[in-house]
Regions:
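Conserved phosphate-binding elements of NTP-dependent enzyme cores
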Residues: 1-254
Length: 254
């Protein structure tokens, strides 16, 4: 789905979604529910598996290795930052001086698994974690992040720091095994290097081979030329938009 900013691309997809309630998987930024405690590890539901390994190795309760439970730094309550509300200004975030941003209490950091504490493990990048955990069952989930070009993310990285394109790819990673579904993505290549765009296109092709249909709002010519069908709206934005300028294959557009 192509067109200048404000031409009606998102509105078209919202209308389409409303016509098929419950049948469309939206991977647009505004549809991804996150908060300050959301991380790639929690979003992909692998944090519990990591905590279980630490708990088993140290013979203590699994809750000790959660910054949302007993393992939380008492000063920042596991947020890693202190948020100061300013009466007439935006809130100010500062790194917690007690845990130095690790989110965990000092007591919890004494426990180790394979020579590293929970904070050190959760600070690993996705690629590092794949090597560290090797044959663990959840490594397959980590590999999905590599497949969408996010191997550089840290397991404990707050998802509030990610770009819109990165957020979409994290959610996309959790849906790679879906079959026969309809997906809507909004500029998923935003901020990506050309090599990463090519990797993402291979992933899209794999998803369509699995019987999925992808509607992609996109400006990238690399994505458009590989599409099966292009719909372009315009000619301008706002009141000047909303008209169908083209509908057909990339070859027909040329």
């Amino acid at each position: 789905i192509a067109g200048v900013a404000g031409s009606g691309k998102s509105s078209l997809m919202e209308y389409f979604t409303s016509q098929y309630p419950g049948e469309v998987i939206s991977i647009r930024q505004k549809d991804i529910g996150i908060n300050l405690r959301s991380t790639p590890a929690t979003y992909l539901d692998i944090a519990d598996a990591i905590r279980a390994l630490f708990a088993k190795a140290n013979h203590v309760a699994q809750a000790y290795f959660s910054f949302n439970s007993k393992g939380a730094c008492p000063a920042c309550q596991g947020k890693g930052v202190i948020i100061s509300d300013m009466a007439y200004m935006d809130s100010i975030e500062t790194v917690c001086e007690v845990c130095h941003g690790t989110r965990y209490s000092e007591e919890v950091l004494k426990y180790q698994y394979k020579g590293k504490n929970i904070a050190e493990v959760m600070d690993m990048t996705v690629r590092q974690a794949i090597q560290f955990f090797e044959d663990a069952d959840f490594v397959r989930k980590l590999d999905t992040l590599v497949q969408v070009g996010l191997g550089y993310l840290h397991l404990n990285q707050s998802m509030t720091t990610l770009s819109g394109g990165e957020l979409q790819r994290v959610k996309l990673a959790s849906k790679l095994d879906e079959r026969g579904q309809i997906f809507i993505l909004d500029e998923p290549t935003d901020g990506l290097h050309l090599d990463d765009i090519r990797r993402l296109m291979k992933l899209f092709n794999r998803m369509t081979d699995q019987g999925n249909t992808l509607f992609i709002i996109e400006h990238s010519l690399d994505v458009m030329k590989d599409a099966d069908y292009i719909v372009e709206l315009g000619p301008g934005g706002g009141l000047a938009g909303g008209s169908l300028l083209f509908a057909g294959t990339p070859k027909e557009m040329l």
